[in-house]
Amino acid sequence: MDNGIKYAVFTEKSLRLLGKNQYTFNVESGFTKTEIKHWVELFFGVKVVAVNSHRLPGKGRRMGPILGHTMHYRRMIITLQLGILFHFYPLNSRVF
């Protein structure tokens, strides 16, 4: 399984959810909740209690006379067990 998580999201809502031990990520749109749950548990070594997701729409873009749009993407809110500390880097890698 490839890395499904694109990046962590830091909005007002996601920062408020950090107090509830919930973390927000944008993920590849083809991944399911169970795949992301298993990937987070394996890669970060934490216990995931729940995974909520929603699909965000693409936005219209214009370059001169050409109309286009950006791709849609999926956002997942991952709830961890209470008392678990979460680091945004994997436990088995070196961070410099």
UniProtKB/Swiss-Prot annotation:
GO terms for biological process: translation. Belongs to the universal ribosomal protein uL23 family. GO terms for cellular component: chloroplast; cytosolic large ribosomal subunit. One of its GO terms (molecular function) is structural constituent of ribosome. Binds to 23S rRNA. It is found in: Plastid, Chloroplast. Keywords: Chloroplast, Plastid, Ribonucleoprotein, Ribosomal protein, RNA-binding, rRNA-binding. This is Large ribosomal subunit protein uL23cz. It comes from Sorghum bicolor (Sorghum). SUPFAM superfamilies: Ribosomal proteins S24e, L23 and L15e (SSF54189). HAMAP family: Ribosomal_uL23_B.
